[in-house]
Amino acid sequence: MIRLFNDIIPIFPILMLIFSIIILFFILNNKNKVKSGCIVTTISIFFSIIYILYIKRFFFNYSSDLIRIDQYSFYFMILLLISSFFTCIFSYSWLLLEDNYSIEFYFFVLLSTIGGMLIIISNHFLSLFLGIELLFLPILGILNFFSNSRKNLFSIVNYMILSVFSSALLLLGVSFIYFVSGRLSFSFFPLIFMYYPSIILNSMMIFGICMILLSLFFKLSLFPLHTWSPNIYQYSNPCSLIFFSTAVKISIFSFLLRFLNFFPYIYKIKSIYYIIYLISMFSVFFGNIIGIIQNNVQRLIGYLSISNIGFLLIIIITQSYSFVFLNKLFIIYLFIYIFGLIGFFSIKSIIDINFIERKNNLLKENSLIGLFWYNPILGILMSIILLSLSGFPITLGFWGKFFIFKHLIQKKFFITTLLIMLSNIVGMQNYLYIIRSLYIKPIKFSNTSLVNNLYISILQKFLLISIGFLFVILGFFPYIF
């Protein structure tokens, strides 16, 4: 009984989310099913966050053949749950507009969240693949939930086909690794490489590792495997993008870190090392430079996210043998990226729903123009978020990139530092372009501004102001981390 209790403690947040899914089945025919579903989902996610924060102080490590939970896992699970929480809160107004299928959105979010948490705590290729499929299949429904656009449907179908192909590559890589090592549990690989170091140079092992990395880079939309990503960002609803743009990155990046930790000898294979290095560099350059020619704001953010993921990959690849999980540098930059995207798409979803209600769908691309003039608070919050993402001086984003440059110089990556700095200047121009549009006088039709009297709930205001407050305080005091 004690053993069973000890096994349940670490996975209790997942069990809590599963229980909330069961409750949702009982309120499918409720008259206020959207409100009830939102309450059930947000409460379960909120208490999962509280539980993890509480147990994090006493619980250190739990390991079995299928899962491994440590302080590193707790950090990523909290980020994933926060992303899900914001998605549920800011999707509520959109779901009220749906006639028939509305509460199903919460099913998708909960299932994807459970899948993401399985990826984060996976210690076996079986649990990893189960988590990946559980994460990505419901996301297809999330992306298409608030849109009937053919372009959106086409981009999702394209993403689905390519995602299936990347999952097949992952399985192919796993099969080659299993053929060479005879193991699927990650915990055994450091021992195998320690006692049989020559196995890492086996051609089938190298091919298997390359296939797995290729699959992960596709799911992270790194260059040149990014072609599906901009269309998803452009045609999907901002409310869906709160979850998609953050949850996928958190989950897959957490596994990539764990994978590189259990396969430390990858750095000895120069070909793989240089390929990862070039992919990260080209991602930073490509995302910033191609963003210049974009006219759609969401598509621009999609390209800039490629650049940000490239930054995170550079942090990892330049640490080589001294790689340490969750150092201050990685925490700061990941925090900026995740909360920046959550804040941006949360504000965008509030604005866009007013266009839907006023039947101004054709004008949604101009929804950020003049935001400051009809809602100064949202305009200022959006400016703070975008300035932080750009790395503007005296913001949290500036310190994140400053620490990256300092780290690269210490590792003697001088040319890399110079190239990234030049690329970052271009990226800053892209963010300033969006910020500039916030302060342009809003367009008027029939003497009426595009959006007047934005409705924002008290909870939504609190969450957005909290993000802005965190960015400002941590911008002045970055060493709080």
Curated annotation (Swiss-Prot):
InterPro entries: NADH-Q_OxRdtase_suN/2, ND/Mrp_TM
Membrane-spanning intervals of the chain: 8-28, 35-55, 76-96, 101-121, 125-145, 160-180, 198-218, 240-260, 272-292, 306-326, 331-351, 367-387, 415-435, 461-481
EC id: 7.1.1.-
UniProt keyword list: Cell membrane, Membrane, NAD, Quinone, Translocase, Transmembrane, Transmembrane helix, Transport, Ubiquinone
GO MF term list: NADH dehydrogenase (ubiquinone) activity; NADH:ubiquinone reductase (non-electrogenic) activity; quinone binding
BP-aspect Gene Ontology terms: ATP synthesis coupled electron transport
Entry's Gene Ontology cellular component terms: plasma membrane
Uppermost EC category: translocase
Domain of life: Bacteria
Reaction equation(s) it catalyzes: a quinone + NADH + 5 H(+)(in) = a quinol + NAD(+) + 4 H(+)(out)
Localization per record: Cell membrane
Membrane topology value: Multi-pass membrane protein
Description of how the protein assembles with itself and partners: NDH-1 is composed of 13 different subunits. Subunits NuoA, H, J, K, L, M, N constitute the membrane sector of the complex.
Job description of the protein: NDH-1 shuttles electrons from NADH, via FMN and iron-sulfur (Fe-S) centers, to quinones in the respiratory chain. The immediate electron acceptor for the enzyme in this species is believed to be ubiquinone. Couples the redox reaction to proton translocation (for every two electrons transferred, four hydrogen ions are translocated across the cytoplasmic membrane), and thus conserves the redox energy in a proton gradient.
Family to which this protein belongs: Belongs to the complex I subunit 2 family.
Protein name: NADH-quinone oxidoreductase subunit N
